[in-house]
Structures are given as structure tokens and as C-alpha cells.
């Protein structure tokens, strides 16, 4: 098997790599993680379904630390992730793709760090480039080669979930500068940074956030948008 330098973390709607692969169980101090190992051209790539293959794990119950530790244990250095998002920005309509460039954190009860007990001393990870600029550049270059259009860079705000946001919350988030909202990129991006892993994420806009269009969020419409974006 070739070295495992790259990983894809599939979010809502992306539950498999789409190529021939075999399953592997990785043991970590935070629990077991199931991944798929796929060979793509000259590289072996790890695929991890964030919510599980059947989407059985809600955002606030995902074992983010186990997932990231498993990838590190396999030797992964670069992670490409996907995330279904709601749009707070009229320039990012339903069905569009964005590249996450920064984040705001509104999560409440998730383990956010590998350094909880202080046994390694005070650890303050620099977050001035949370979503790796180099990987974002590669994403945009690959998209151009394959005629896939990104609407632009987006500031992502992460909520606890699993409920959707209120109109009042969305109004506040827009004032804070958020472009899209989701429930999973934090603490994933933070934990990757703590482990020294390069991490980038594509946002699939599956709905306009509450108060941004004429009606309530329709789960059926979200499913349709996920299927459409998966092909991209």
C-alpha cells in the first residue's frame, strides 16, 4: 500500500469515496474509527464518513478527536473535507460551492482540544490560517481544471445543532460577518490544526438560512441539493 498522506472527510451526503476501496479500523485513545482506504492514481487516500456510512451520528455526538487522531495515526498530512451549509450571503445561492476561509464558533458542549488536562503545559494554537491556504489554492486549481465553479471564500459559523437556527440568530450571525452556517467544521478544523495537519473544506450550499428567503427550510429540498452537489 502506498503512503497515506491524504484524507477526505465526507460530510452530509458524502458517505463513500466513489472508487474501489477496503475498510480499516483504527484504534485511538478516544475510540475506534472506521475508514476506507482507496487508491487513486499514484496515491492511497483515506476516506472517513464524518456522520458514519448511514448518517447515524448527529453533529454534536461525532467523536471528532478520535477521527482526527485516527487520520494522524495513519500518517495523513493533508485533509480535504466537505460540509453541507446554509447560506447567509445572497451571493452564495442554493446549489453553489464555496471554500471555507475562516470560522466563528457557537458550539457549546463539544470537546474542543487535545490539550484538556494541561499535562503538556499551556498550548495556544495559532488560528490565523485555520483552513490551509495552500490546500485552498489546490482546491481552486482542481476545480478550474474540471470546470467546477466556486462562488468564493466563505466565513463559516458553527452551531451546536442538531436543530436549525432561528431568524434572530441568523440576523446576528450576518452582523458578525458569517457567510455560511453549519454544525461540524468546529472542532474538526481546530483539532487538525492542533495536530499540525493541513485542512481545507468545501461548503455545499443546500439551503438559504432562515429569514434569507420566502419560506421555512425544507428537508426534501436539502436532499435534492446534496445529491446535485455530490456529483460536483
What are these model-derived regions, one by one?
Residues 1-127:
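Metabolite-binding pocket within alpha/beta catalytic cores that recognizes anionic/polar moieties
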Residues 55-60, 157-160, 178:
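Short, flexible loop segments at the rims of nucleotide/cofactor-binding pockets, characterized by
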Residues 96-101, 198-201, 217-220:
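Short, hinge-like loop/turn segments at secondary-structure boundaries
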Residues 102-105, 204-210:
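Short, acidic/turn-prone active-site loops that include or flank metal/cofactor-
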Residues 130-175:
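Active-site rim beta-loop-alpha module in soluble metabolic enzymes
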Residues 167-208:
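A C-terminal functional module that forms or caps the active site or interfaces directly
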Residues 210-232:
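His/Asp/Glu-rich mid-to-C-terminal helical/loop segments that flank catalytic regions of hydrolases
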Amino acid at each position: 500500500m502506498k503512503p497515506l498522506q491524504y484524507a477526505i472527510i465526507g460530510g452530509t451526503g458524502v458517505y463513500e469515496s466513489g472508487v474501489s476501496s477496503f475498510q480499516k479500523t483504527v484504534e485511538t485513545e478516544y475510540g475506534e474509527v472506521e475508514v476506507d482506504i482507496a487508491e487513486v492514481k499514484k496515491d492511497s487516500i483515506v476516506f472517513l464518513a464524518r456522520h458514519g456510512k448511514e448518517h447515524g451520528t448527529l453533529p454534536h455526538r461525532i467523536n471528532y478527536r478520535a477521527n482526527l487522531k485516527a487520520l494522524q495515526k495513519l500518517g495523513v498530512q493533508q485533509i480535504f473535507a466537505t460540509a453541507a451549509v446554509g447560506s447567509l450571503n445572497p451571493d452564495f445561492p442554493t446549489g453553489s460551492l464555496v471554500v471555507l476561509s475562516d470560522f466563528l464558533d457557537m458550539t457549546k458542549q463539544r470537546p474542543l482540544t487535545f490539550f484538556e488536562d494541561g499535562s503538556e503545559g499551556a498550548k495556544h494554537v495559532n488560528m490565523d490560517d485555520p483552513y490551509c491556504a495552500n490546500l485552498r489554492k489546490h482546491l481552486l486549481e482542481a476545480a478550474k481544471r474540471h470546470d467546477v465553479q466556486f462562488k468564493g471564500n466563505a466565513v463559516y459559523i458553527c452551531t451546536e445543532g442538531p436543530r436549525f437556527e432561528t431568524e434572530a440568530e441568523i440576523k446576528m450571525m450576518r452582523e458578525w460577518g458569517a457567510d455560511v452556517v453549519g454544525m461540524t467544521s468546529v472542532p474538526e478544523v481546530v483539532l487538525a490544526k492542533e495536530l499540525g495537519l493541513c485542512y481545507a473544506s468545501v461548503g455545499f450550499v443546500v439551503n438559504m438560512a432562515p429569514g434569507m428567503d420566502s419560506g421555512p427550510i425544507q428537508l426534501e429540498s436539502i436532499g435534492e441539493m446534496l445529491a446535485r452537489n455530490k456529483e460536483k
